[in-house]
């Protein structure tokens, strides 16, 4: 895991001239890519997704689709996937799922821009 991801055990450093460990997200692309060629998919920061957060139903589903919007009387939360530098290795996986309020900011959370592969680009 250390070659491709960040977690609580491998993201600390001691800035020059300072005492005490400090923890924070790392610059993108400093670790090796995973088997799909993607960087920083495990650890570093958890990622907010476009999907609204709601509890899963009782049945198993593959790629469940959430609502387009939530009722105004329901707390507005997005799905947050994966673990970050502040979590242990077992939580640094893309299937880790949590809720994150849309009106909050946090140095533990980021997002990933995704674009389909462009064909015949010169």
Please tell me what each predicted stretch does.
Residues 20-24, 40-122:
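Surface-exposed recognition segments
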């Amino acid at each position: 895991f250390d070659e491709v991801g960040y977690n609580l055990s491998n993201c600390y450093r001691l800035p020059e001239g300072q005492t005490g460990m400090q923890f924070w997200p790392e610059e993108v692309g400093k670790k090796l890519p995973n088997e799909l060629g993607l960087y920083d998919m495990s650890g570093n920061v958890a990622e907010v997704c476009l999907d609204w957060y709601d509890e899963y139903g009782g049945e198993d589903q593959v790629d469940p689709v959430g609502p387009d919007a939530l009722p105004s009387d329901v707390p507005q939360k997005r799905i947050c996937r994966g673990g970050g530098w502040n979590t242990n290795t077992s939580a640094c996986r893309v299937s880790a799922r949590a809720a994150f309020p849309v009106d909050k900011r946090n140095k533990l959370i980021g997002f990933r821009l995704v674009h389909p592969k462009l064909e015949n680009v010169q």
